[in-house]
Amino acid sequence: MLNWNEEHTELCKSMSKNWLSFRPFEENPKGLMLISTDIIQKFKDCGFSIETITNPQASYRPIIIARKEVNGARNTVGFFGHYDVEPVVKINQWSSDPWELVDKDNRWFGRGLADNLVPLAQRLILFDQITSLPLNLIYVLQGEEEIGSPFALEMYPKIDLPKVDLWIEETGYFYKDGRQRIMLFNRNIMIEKILDGIIEMNNVDDRGYTIRERPLNKAFGAEHCPCLLHLVGDTPYLAIGPNDDFSTIHGVNESISPKLLPVCTSQYELIFKELST
C-alpha cells in the first residue's frame, strides 16, 4: 500500500528544503505565510478539504485543519503538529547555514528539519499514496508552537471534530544505539495490535525498542500543549517518526536521518491497515 524509495526521499528533501528557505519563525511573518499557503495546497493536492482559523492579530499563521473523509470508512486517524520553527540564536556555532538544507554524513542539517518539517513532509508524501483506503484522516496544524501556542490554546477547545480513533504525535524518537522509543498512552485493543506489529517489525530488523507510556517531550511542557490538552483526551495516542538522539532540536546543527524514513513508512502502513479493516 505504502512505498518509500529514493525518489520519495528526494521529494521529501526538496519539500523540506523549500520550506526551510521560507524561514518560518515568528519574527518572519512572510515566511509563516508562505509555508502555510504551500502546506494548504499540498493537502488539497492529496484530496483533503481545508478549514482555517485565523487570528486577527496574526493572520500570517492560521490554524490549519485538513480533513479527508472516505465513504464507508469506520475509523479516523488524527495527526497534529506545527509548521513554525525555532529561530536561530547561535548562528555562528552552526557548521552550515541553518536556513539551507545541507546533506552531510547521511543526515540533513537545517533549523526545524527535525521539529518538524521533515516528519510533516513525509506524511504528506504518504497521504498522496492513499487513494482508496477506507480510512478517514484529520490533520490539525498550528504556526505558533515555538512561542507557546497562545491562539491555539484559545481555539482548540472550540474546534468541532468527528470522533478520532487514534491520535498520532508530530514525530517519534530513536536512540543513538538505534533503539526506537515508542511513546503511547490511553491503551486499548486496537493500539495493542499496532504495538505488537511495531515490535515485530523491530525484531525482524534486529532493532531494539523501549516503550514509554507518556507523550513526546514538549518545550513548554505537556501541560501547555493545546493538542494534548484539548484534542487527545482519552483517545489512544502514539508518537512515531524519524527524530533521534542526534537531532538536537532547538539546538545548534539540528538534523534528521533520512535513513529512518523507510522505517517510519512501514509503521504508518501498519497503522493505516489496522484502522481500515
Regions found by a protein language model. Name each.
Residues 1-91, 256-263, 269, 274:
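N-terminal helical capping/dimerization or prosegment-like subdomains
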Residues 45-54, 103, 203-216:
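Short secondary-structure junctions
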Residues 51, 77-79, 140, 166-168, ...:
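Hydrophobic/aromatic beta-strand patches that form the interior of the parallel beta-sheet core
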Residues 53, 81-83, 143-144, 170-172, ...:
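Fold-independent oxyanion-binding glycine-rich loops
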Residues 72, 176-177, 194-277:
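An extended, acidic, His-containing surface patch that forms the Zn2+-binding/catalytic region
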Residues 75-138:
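Active-site metal-coordination/substrate-binding segment of hydrolases
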Residues 112-186:
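Acidic/histidine-rich catalytic neighborhood of metal-dependent amide-processing enzymes
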Residues 115-122, 190, 224-228, 264:
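Catalytic-loop motifs flanking and including active-site residues across diverse enzymes
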